[in-house]
């Protein structure tokens, strides 16, 4: 079965692409408000995602759209201090999560997949995440993977429940991120109890062995740091070290480092670049004067990473857009500024991680289908026949879900309509003699 997704807070489509690559999902609607990101998204997917998910117009459009899974890489925002007792419509009002929750409450998708920064776990002393979990589990009727109830009926989870690092999914980037996956109890009923309590912790494919496999062998001189800026960074790091702080630049492929790995690349660019400096001496660079830099280029062979290298770290280049002929088709629209390229990659997701999550979600769907159809067959064996109402009561599922399961069992020729009835079904004697 192919599941339909909607891609909200879409950026340049990293989450969508990861789900598509699993082979089980196709996207039917998107929403993004950043003009430059929209241009890249349109360039990559042939679809203009320029929609504002906070508007009533868009929410009505979603309500009219047949889809199964809501995807969103939403921003981390503080909620009202009014308290959870008021419900998400009061507690989260004015945030993007409020609008996501509103859309979920109106449309009840089969599953929800949310991505956010690692800081979401501890944001506002944990209150932000607590509100999100409480909203999904308590108000919207979803089972969140990695969340359980303690003896007092409080939601229980740890960092390990949600945080996964890109470096464990085939790319050399130390990028811990929050991933929240939830399944509708209204649709799947007690089927959600059959699901595992843990998201995938590692991928099964190495995309780039280490940072050396990501780096371009030769880059344009413009990526080399000016002597003045390089000296400023060294002085800043010395001050930080003197004050007992570990902040400052980092040369991630310095001599002696085995299996080098990049630090997190960021949409803001600055610290993401300075914490990912590259040692790569190049003849003729030292002392060279460029019009774009105030001082000559440094003599130590230090440069920043290129947008192409950032694209590889996120799995966009060298992985996510390779066609059936093995050709890498990723590109930005002509004229996209270098600063925008850094921003869009830094603000996106790591596609190999998302693909692994998508495959895990598919496995969850398959497991619930298998378990629930098995229970239906067991009941038919015990009672001779079964109705839609029996399935609803047995599995605690919606009528739509009961009809879906029954349809699959009939198409598989496991069940047939009982003779002389219109609503009762029995085992197919040819399949179950």
Language model features with spans:
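Conserved SAM/SAH-binding beta-strand->alpha-helix loop
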Residues: 34
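Conserved SAM-binding loop
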Residues: 41
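Class I SAM-dependent methyltransferase "Motif I" SAM/SAH-binding loop
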Residues: 8-13
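Conserved SAM-binding strand-loop segment of SAM-dependent methyltransferases
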Residues: 47-53
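C-terminal target-recognition/interaction regions appended to catalytic cores
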Residues: 229-374, 381-382, 388-404, 421, ...
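Class I S-adenosyl-L-methionine
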Residues: 60-67, 77, 81-272, 284-287
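A short, conserved structural fragment
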Residues: 410-420
């Amino acid at each position: 079965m192919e599941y339909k997704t909607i891609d909200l807070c879409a950026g340049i489509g990293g989450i969508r692409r990861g789900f598509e690559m699993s082979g089980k999902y196709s996207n039917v609607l998107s929403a993004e408000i950043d003009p430059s990101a929209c241009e890249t998204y349109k360039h990559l997917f042939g679809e203009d995602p320029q929609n504002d998910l906070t508007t009533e117009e868009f929410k009505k459009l979603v309500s009219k759209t047949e889809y199964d899974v809501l995807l969103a890489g939403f921003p981390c925002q503080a909620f009202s201090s009014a308290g959870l007792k008021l419900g998400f419509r009061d507690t989260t009002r004015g945030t993007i999560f409020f609008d996501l929750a509103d859309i979920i409450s109106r449309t009840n998708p089969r599953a929800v997949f949310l991505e956010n920064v690692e800081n979401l776990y501890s944001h506002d002393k944990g209150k932000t995440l607590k509100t999100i979990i409480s909203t999904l589990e308590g108000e919207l009727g979803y089972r969140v993977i990695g969340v359980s109830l303690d003896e007092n009926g409080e939601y229980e989870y740890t960092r390990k429940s949600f945080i996964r690092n890109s470096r464990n999914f085939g790319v050399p980037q130390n990028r811990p991120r929050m991933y929240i996956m939830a399944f509708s109890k209204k649709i799947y009923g007690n089927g959600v109890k059959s699901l595992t309590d843990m998201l995938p912790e590692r991928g099964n494919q190495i995309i780039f062995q280490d940072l050396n496999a990501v780096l371009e062998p030769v880059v344009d001189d413009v990526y080399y740091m000016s002597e003045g800026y390089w000296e400023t960074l060294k002085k800043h790091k010395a001050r930080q070290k003197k004050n007992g702080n570990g902040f400052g630049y980092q040369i991630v492929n310095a001599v002696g480092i085995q299996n080098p790995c990049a630090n997190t690349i960021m949409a803001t660019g600055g610290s993401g670049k300075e914490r990912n400096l590259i040692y790569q001496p190049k003849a003729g660079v030292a002392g060279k004067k460029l019009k774009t830099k105030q001082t000559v280029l440094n003599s130590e062979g230090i440069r920043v990473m290129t947008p192409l290298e950032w694209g590889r770290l996120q799995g966009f280049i060298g992985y996510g857009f390779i066609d059936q002929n093995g050709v890498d088709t990723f590109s930005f629209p002509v004229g996209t500024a270098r600063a925008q390229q850094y921003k869009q990659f830094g603000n996106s997701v790591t596609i190999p991680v998302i693909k692994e999550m998508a495959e895990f979600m598919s496995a969850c769907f398959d497991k619930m289908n298998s378990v629930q159809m098995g229970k239906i067959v067991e009941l038919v064996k015990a009672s001779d026949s079964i109705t839609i109402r029996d399935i609803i009561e047995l599995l605690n599922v919606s009528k739509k879900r009961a009809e879906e399961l029954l349809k699959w069992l009939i198409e598989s020729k496991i069940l047939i309509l009982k003779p002389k009835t219109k609503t009762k079904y029995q085992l197919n004697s040819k399949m179950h003699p």
